[in-house]
Amino acid sequence: MSEYTNEHFNNRELSWLDFNERVLEEAMDERNPLMERLKFLAIFSSNLDEFYMVRVGGLKDEVLAGFNRPEDKTGLTPKQQIKSISMRAQELVETQYATYKKITKQLSNQHVRFLRTKHLNKTQQDFVKEYFRTHVFPVLTPIAVDAYRPFPMLLSKSLNIAVEIASNGEGKKRLALVQVPSVLPRYLELPTDDEEHTDLILLEDLIIQFIDSLFKGFVVESTMPFRITRNADMPFHEEGSRDVLKQIEKELKKRRYGVAIRLEVQQRSLRKELLFMLQDVLDLHDRDIFIVDGPIDLTFLFGIYNQIGMEYDDMINETLIPFIPEGLESGKDLFQSIAKQDYLLHHPYHSFDPIVRFIVQAAKDPNVLAIKQTLYRVSGDSPIIKALTDAAESGKQVTVLVELKARFDEEKNIQWAKQLEKAGAHVIYGYKELKTHSKITLVVRILEGGVLQRFIHLGTGNYNDSTAKLYTDIGLLTTNEELAEDATNFFNWLSGYGERPSWHQFETSPDDMKDFFLNKIDDEIKLHEKYGNGRIVAKMNSITDRAIITKLYDASSAGVKIDLIVRGICCLRPGIKGVSENIKVISIIDRYLEHSRIFYFYQNGKEDLYCSSADWMTRNMKKRIEILFPILNASHKTYIKDMMALQLVDNVKARRQRSDGRYVYVKRETNEEEIQSQIIIHQYTGGRWNNIPSVFEREPSNWAEREVLRLRAENEKMTDD
């Protein structure tokens, strides 16, 4: 079928909201511990903030510019998308706050209470009064709003309190604003009579309790907390810039004061006159206003989880200790180990520590001549940055591509770039109009006799030791000569001038990766027509590229069996008769964020397997520098296939997409044991594969079940031996 209609696709933005709904489902899932559910509420809020700042902001820009062309998959115009987004987002936020109320009630039963000032006992009242006097009052600034003092330009995502006041001798009402200080904790832990109990109060409630102290001689008539979200979809103007770093620094200052795109107000404090005034000043449509039944901005729950949650073992997930492969343990010479064999690491089941030590050892090793690395997002106190700094200061040749345009990490990356340059590293920022999203490190080491040996790390995720504990990613440590040659040419291409090199093993975007994928799917179609065994399994964060989607539809129509594991946006619709009936799509949302990108093509038994920094998104194919690399080692292939096999039979955290685009939990059959893939993958990675669910005993009907059945047979054989 060559022509596909709008009904064969999901809209990108609405599909993202479906993903965030799946995040919200984790907060609603009573199988999860209470504090974990709180954390998912915070993740939902954080996700939605960024979505509005970037995606909705971009759509509003298009409307203001008079751009009303339908998008290329579902045919919705920017105006239609904004309307649909608003309706869906309002529904989800309403569900979020209903869930918040339910969870906080359950927490209260477990002696963790969120209190308002009227619920405090005498000791707590005295405590908050003193805290306000010594910690809060000195940093508050009341801002009058009148003809001579116009409504201020409030920072995006800052929490504020609108205050309606009247003088003692007048009936005339006046308006003032008080910003809730972001330099103070959002909540305060209160003294209790029992160490088993935890009582908390929010900073805005505490401020409102004593807000009259800011307006001597006036009576506070009403208060209304509110929060503005501003457009952060501000493209960097690189054309003609002599210094990209300085240009980006300049552009970043504008982001905090972009056009308002969303207003959140608290339902219990709602004052219609104040709301209408804010709506008028900010020039917002009714659909841009979110009236929430609880505290504004639930991202403060991250702090509750990290600080309070850790005190309650029964309210958080049991920690899964990551494994370290033999040969990469602390104290081992990593170069000696990697020279003997390639290592595949699957984070966070495998510790990220060997990757950090790989860079640290390279920085300290006198035989290392050069270190080259791409950095997209790193942690706040990055040991990798420190190691690269030390290496540069010791005289090693250090080349680092720091991506200054990594969304919301720009300021941090500018700081790292300056630090590395000061240390003597050669810092580059990539190509104009492209983001360098590749994850690659090259270490050049001299051996006895002057022979050079190259060590490479390739990955699907960032060099971020913090998120590596939460994101699932694949990493490869190798000395493979062809991969090493490709890595050398890749860095030379980034840092110098010249045409893109010819690769031995790599495929890269924006040049040839998309064509490579289209050709691989075409090959699978041809082989299926000849042998009848076509099979594609792909795992990624999102799929949006129309050309790849339609090529998958062609493959499905030809009879190729396709399984897609897509955590986030999925513009493809599976199960449509005559279009995608041979395609299945699942999404897994669990304790770890599924982040690895893996692509499997059966190829009539050849079984080609690749990992990449790229998703099947148009931006990855056209607007980013990405690397796709093959998995060549047979045991590594087996591990990755086994891992994907387990995910494809997950019946606890997997949701399948229906042909109408909606997601439902994978239904567990009667008497079928629970298969929570992330837990089982952890056991499998550690070699503890002893308890196989009985579901594997039925006749395998697809590639996934055949693979798991094979694993079970191997495990039983090992046990018998």
From Swiss-Prot:
It comes from Exiguobacterium sp. (strain ATCC BAA-1283 / AT1b). It comes from the Bacteria. This is Polyphosphate kinase. The keyword Acetylation does not apply. Keywords: ATP-binding, Kinase, Magnesium, Metal-binding, Nucleotide-binding, Phosphoprotein, Transferase. Belongs to the polyphosphate kinase 1 (PPK1) family. It catalyses: [phosphate](n) + ATP = [phosphate](n+1) + ADP. InterPro entries: PP_kinase (IPR003414), PP_kinase_C_1 (IPR041108), PP_kinase_middle (IPR024953), PP_kinase_middle_dom_sf (IPR036830), PPK_C_dom2 (IPR025200), PPK_N_dom (IPR025198), PPK_N_dom_sf (IPR036832). Catalyzes the reversible transfer of the terminal phosphate of ATP to form a long-chain polyphosphate (polyP). It is an enzyme of class 2 (transferase). The active site is at residue 437. GO terms for biological process: polyphosphate biosynthetic process. The gene is ppk. ATP binds at residues 47, 471, 567, 595. Pfam families: PP_kinase, PP_kinase_C, PP_kinase_C_1, PP_kinase_N. The keyword Transferase applies. Its EC number is 2.7.4.1. An intermediate of this reaction is the autophosphorylated ppk in which a phosphate is covalently linked to a histidine residue through a N-P bond. One of its GO terms (molecular function) is ATP binding. Gene3D superfamilies: Endonuclease Chain A, Polyphosphate kinase middle domain, Polyphosphate kinase N-terminal domain. Mg(2+) binds at residues 377, 407. GO terms for cellular component: polyphosphate kinase complex. Its cofactor is Mg(2+).
